[in-house]
Design a protein with these regions (language model features):
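Flexible, glycine/charged-enriched surface loops at secondary-structure junctions
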Residues: 10, 56, 168-169, 181-189, ...
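A short helix->loop->beta-strand "cap" motif at the edges of active sites that frequently abuts
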Residues: 104-110, 124-125, 273, 322, ...
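Thiamine diphosphate
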Residues: 19-101, 239, 246-352, 361-382, ...
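Short gly/pro/ser/thr-enriched loop/turn and capping motifs at secondary-structure boundaries
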Residues: 60-63, 117-120, 135, 248-249, ...
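Flexible, low-complexity linker and terminal segments
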Residues: 221-235, 374, 379-612
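Metallocofactor- and cofactor-centric catalytic cores in central/energy metabolism, strongly enriched
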Residues: 14, 71-75, 88, 92-93, ...
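Active-site cofactor/cluster-binding pocket
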Residues: 2-235, 239-241
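A glycine-rich phosphate-binding loop feature that marks nucleotide/adenosyl-phosphate handling sites
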Residues: 59, 211-214, 247-250, 279, ...
Length: 612
């Protein structure tokens, strides 16, 4: 067992040394008050200074009036997972201000709306009262707009206190509002008012600040839903059937915008796509399956409640072998749960979705780049294996902005799998829709409209034989189910392999997937630097697993599966896959609805190590 030491106390002489480019800022406002634009400007300004950043929006499941928090993390080491400790608070919401202040760690800074009178709450914080209403009045004559514009004042105040480059703030604002000259001028004047007030009344914040670096050159800021939508377009999607649901709606909206731009016949001006907002998620999947059967590249997107409704049609697509892509941007459950909080809670329900024996292909992106590349790959896999393929994102990855390298133009053609043309049918002289010709479990198919007498077949969700004829014979049913299992085994060699980061000295292994990846990177450094515990790491990128997983677990003394759900769903799947070594596998679970953080992972692993 690894030796665990108590972390040494920080040198008191360093307690007031200004920390540069390593801080977390939380803005507490009211939903619908216009703070999103101000927060985006602040995030982008720091990003444009060359400092690695991430933004996390914790918002309520209503349109306006309830508390919302936006956290910006800047870190010179490139750590972009959520950090629990807040170093600077902007308190704009009277309902939560006192609790927000009491939750801060010592020596934090607080900018607050002056009437809230927070200064007396704690003596170990630095307070900066700002008269927002007084400052916004001369900047914005229209009283109806003041509640929106006033948020830009705290951008200016923070620019002074933390040394955010004002020129970069101006560029960021221009990127946000450049197409609206009046709004641009109005908001810039509000930022200037905040800067001027802060310069006249406050010293720089002595504990934290930012300074220009060169670690974001060439990178972009983008959310996972937008990246996935771009991937779907490059994959050739022409049919989107969907039903609105948080947090996946923005993905569909992005696909629709791109279709309007790029799926129009240049000669006629007519649309070459179909978008259907269905009456519910079940209907949406039914439409997508019909389109996939007809030969279109079709998709739907949803979240956990929609996945529950889609079970019956998913089983149909699996059994009759129709390609379709389903993007699940996961949120908390069960039932309505917390619609605007994140979780990785749909893994077990999705991999086995439907009644009877079904096992589905799941792709598990951990970055916006993989949201892009895996959404493309999902369509290829769906057609190659003639089956539903699920892309499993989550709210944190899908709706928050992340740093990323520019998305690369695809370098390989679309792969449609085993599709027979009329010429193929004429040459082979025989076609049996569900026959395993090649031994890989994947049959050949034809598309409606193929002009050959052998091409048509009847697609049925009831029992069928190799010729697609109705059959209740036990041998036909068993033969079909065995072939479907062979097809799934073949998929092990085709889905994205896990990424393994080895350490020759490691006895402890960590397994994770999806957006948890970023907290894992930081937690591994914490374990090594604070406790001298080296770790190896395997990041699962798809189901079904390949042999890399078994080999990884076999090499380790103990393996911790880290995930964001209560029941350790991925851990159970890992234990099934490595049943000979399942006693090595332990579970680290996080399920508050907030994105997972490194310290939670580190502390839980250390606790389990101490307990044996």
């Amino acid at each position: 067992m690894a030796t665990i030491e108590q972390a040494a106390p920080r040198d008191a002489s360093l307690r007031h040394k200004r920390v540069i480019n390593d801080m977390s800022i939380q803005v507490a406002t009211v939903n619908g008050s216009g703070s999103q634009t101000a927060n985006s400007v602040l995030l982008r300004a720091i990003f444009q200074m060359g400092i690695p950043v991430s933004g996390k929006n914790i918002f309520p499941s209503n349109i306006a009036g309830l508390p919302t928090w936006y956290t910006i993390r800047a870190n010179h080491n490139g750590y972009i997972a959520r950090k629990k400790e807040i170093d600077f608070l902007v308190a704009m919401n009277a309902e939560t201000a006192r609790e927000d202040v009491m939750n801060l760690q010592a020596a934090a800074g607080v900018v607050y709306d002056e009437p809230l009178n927070l200064k007396s709450l704690r003596s170990d914080l630095t307070f900066y009262p700002v008269p927002f209403d007084k400052l916004v009045a001369p900047v914005c004559p229209d009283a109806r707009l003041r509640r929106l514009v006033r948020n830009m004042i705290y951008v200016g105040v923070l620019a002074h206190l933390l040394d955010v480059d004002l020129a970069e703030a101006e560029k960021a604002l221009n990127k946000q509002l450049g197409s609206k000259p009046k709004a641009l001028a109005l908001n810039w004047n509000a930022i200037r008012a905040g800067v001027d007030y802060a310069q006249q009344n406050f010293q720089k914040f002595e504990r934290f600040g930012v300074a220009r670096m060169n670690k974001t050159a060439g990178k972009i800021l983008i959310d996972g839903n937008s990246a996935a939508a771009i991937g779907c377009m490059f994959a050739g999607v022409t049919v989107l059937a969907w039903y609105p649901i948080t947090p996946s709606s923005s993905l569909a909206e992005a696909v629709i915008d791109y279709m309007h731009q790029y799926r129009v016949d240049p000669q006629t001006g007519k649309a070459t796509y179909a978008i259907v907002q269905a009456e519910d998620e079940l209907a949406a999947l039914g439409i997508a399956i019909g389109a996939g059967w007809a030969g279109a590249r079709a998709m739907t997107n949803t979240s956990g409640p929609g996945i529950s409704l889609m079970a019956e049609f998913t089983g149909l697509a699996y059994y009759v072998e129709v390609p379709v892509v389903i993007i699940d941007v996961q949120r908390t459950g069960p039932s309505t749960g917390l619609p605007t909080r994140t979780m990785q809670g749909d893994i077990l329900s999705t991999v086995y979705l439907s009644h009877g024996d079904t096992m589905h292909i799941l792709l598990l992106p951990s970055s916006v780049e993989e949201c892009y590349t895996m959404s493309m790959e999902a369509f290829d896999l769906a057609e190659e294996f003639q089956t539903p393929v699920f892309l499993m994102s989550d709210l944190d990855l899908g709706m928050n902005n992340w740093m990323a390298d520019p998305l690369e133009y695809p370098d390989k053609p679309i792969a449609r799998g085993k599709v027979l043309s009329a010429a193929d049918l004429e040459r082979i002289g025989k076609f049996e829709r569900y026959r395993d010709v090649d031994g890989d479990g994947i049959p050949y198919r034809t598309l409606p409209g193929t002009e050959h007498p052998l091409a048509p077949y009847f697609t049925r969700g009831s029992g069928h034989n190799e010729k697609a004829g109705y059959s209740e014979k036990p041998e036909d049913y068993k033969n079909n189910m065995d072939r479907l299992r062979r097809k799934y085994e073949t998929a092990r060699t085709r889905v994205p392999a896990p990424v393994v980061e080895s350490d020759p000295n490691a006895e402890i292994g960590i397994i994770a997937f999806g957006s948890s990846h970023w907290a894992i990177l930081e937690a591994r450094d914490q374990l090594r630097q604070e406790q001298n515990i080296p770790t190896a790491y395997l990041r699962i990128r798809a189901l079904p697993f390949n042999d890399d997983l078994r080999d990884f677990v076999k090499r380790m003394k103990r393996v911790y599966v880290v995930e964001q759900n209560r029941d350790g769903q991925m851990c159970e799947l890992v234990r099934l896959a490595v049943w000979r070594d399942c006693n090595k596998v332990r579970s680290v679970r996080h399920y508050t609805g907030f994105p997972i953080d490194a310290r939670t992972i580190t502390d839980e692993i250390l606790t389990q190590e101490l307990s044996g």
